Design a protein with these regions (language model features):
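N-terminal helical hairpins
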Residues: 1-19, 34-35
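N-terminal core-binding DNA-recognition domain of tyrosine site-specific recombinases/integrases
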Residues: 17, 21-22, 29-111, 157-162, ...
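Basic, Lys/Arg- and aromatic-enriched nucleic-acid-binding interface segment
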Residues: 88, 103, 107, 113-180, ...
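C-terminal catalytic core of tyrosine-transesterase DNA break-rejoin enzymes
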Residues: 103, 168-182, 273-280, 296-329, ...
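Conserved tyrosine-mediated DNA breakage-rejoining catalytic core shared by Y-recombinases
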Residues: 117-120, 186-247
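Active-site/catalytic core of tyrosine-dependent DNA strand-transfer enzymes
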Residues: 143-147, 230, 236-288
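Short functional hotspots where side chains directly engage DNA or cofactors
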Residues: 195-200, 258, 291-294, 302, ...
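DNA/chromatin major-groove-contacting recognition/catalytic segments
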Residues: 210-215, 314-315, 336-355
């Protein structure tokens, strides 16, 4: 009798719908997500699982979960002040998970059907935050900050040694709009100084060290594909960018097949180290802390809004041209981030349209 009872319990436990969310969702991540997504993406999914889902829903039985349970989770995360991005990713992971359970017929009803898609405007309103156009949420350098940053980046000790290691990398990023992963992924043979171009072909990211799906201590560098297909592109080099490349090679050069921005051993540099050195320059220059991506935003904003020449003319690029330079999939993305509404240009345009 005990044997039969134990056997029946094992059968019940083996049914996915009878498991708790903690065990079932972890199994889904390890079996279905890990083999099919980038390591960095898996790390993020795992963090969402551990920090945003398990503490609040981990003990619930899968087949008993209702839309109300998930709405309650979203509401809790909102009240705790989590960013829209974090809560949206939580929603997306749960949506994928319950869709999988439905396809495999582990549950009879999908609770996500009762949970509306999260809208950013509604989410921010609930947190009493102002809803701003995307172009007003990005951080860029002012002209004064650019000059202060460049002055600090070029400083040297009396011995002639640069004060900041590989500071020319930031000048290169400021003049090309490269993403951090793209800049670190450059190898010397990607660059043609005669033609004044560089070929963006790979990216460098950091991920959790693992033995299969099992986490190990520390982080490791992942050299792999770019963010999107359009990220693979040819980027023109202005004279400032060319000089930055020459400075980087004078500081460290390990050959044509080595990274342009190598570590001391000639290997790819960790993104974390590049960020730390960037913050060090900002601090020394007395500039308010900004993300490294601000260099890209500044470059793109300058291209769209234009640069005024000495004769008063303004040189600017179209959103389509900027999109191609940045590796955006569409020019709509470029417009959303970098084209600001100019209501002054609307003055008088309705004259003659009296109805």
């Amino acid at each position: 009798t005990d044997y039969i009872s134990k056997f029946e319990e094992e059968i019940i436990d083996a049914i996915e719908g009878n498991k708790n969310v903690k065990d079932s969702l972890l199994n889904y991540l390890q079996v279905f997500k890990y083999p099919n997504v980038e390591r960095v993406t898996y790390d993020r999914n795992e963090q969402i699982y551990k920090n945003q889902i398990v503490p609040y829903m981990g003990k619930l039985i899968v087949s008993n979960i209702t839309g109300a349970d998930i709405k309650r989770l979203i509401s809790t995360l909102t009240d705790k002040g989590y960013s829209f991005s974090t809560v949206k990713q939580t929603y997306n992971l749960l949506n994928e998970y319950f869709d999988y359970l439905m396809r495999e017929e582990f549950i009879k009803k999908n609770p996500m059907n009762a949970v509306p898609t999260i809208k950013k405007s509604n989410y921010l309103a609930k947190q009493n935050k102002e809803v701003l156009p995307v172009c007003e949420t990005i951080t860029v350098f002012t002209d004064e900050e650019i000059e202060k940053f460049k002055a600090e980046a070029h400083k040297k000790y009396p011995s002639g040694k640069p004060k900041h290691n590989q500071a020319a990398a930031y000048i290169l990023m400021l003049n090309t709009g490269l993403r951090t992963a793209e800049a670190l992924g450059l190898i010397n043979s990607d660059i043609d100084l005669e033609k004044k171009v560089m070929h963006i072909q790979r990216g460098v990211k950091e991920a959790q060290k693992r033995d299969g799906t099992e986490r190990k201590s520390g982080r490791e560098i992942i050299v792999g594909k770019l963010k999107t297909a359009s990220s693979k592109r040819i980027v023109p080099l202005n004279e400032t960018a060319i000089q930055a490349i020459i400075e980087l090679r004078n500081e460290r050069y390990f050959g044509e097949d080595a990274p342009l921005i190598p570590d001391a051993d000639g290997n790819f540099t960790r993104p974390l180290n590049l960020r730390k050195r960037f913050y060090s320059i900002l601090d020394a220059a007395g500039i308010e802390k900004k993300g490294l991506h601000s260099l890209r935003h500044t470059f793109a904003t300058k291209l769209v809004t234009g640069v005024r020449a000495e004769d008063g003319t303004v040189k600017a690029l179209t959103p389509r041209q900027v999109a191609d330079l940045l590796g955006h999939t569409t020019s709509e993305i470029t417009e959303m981030y970098y084209v600001k509404r100019n209501t002054d240009m609307l003055m008088g345009v309705t004259n003659g349209f009296e109805l």
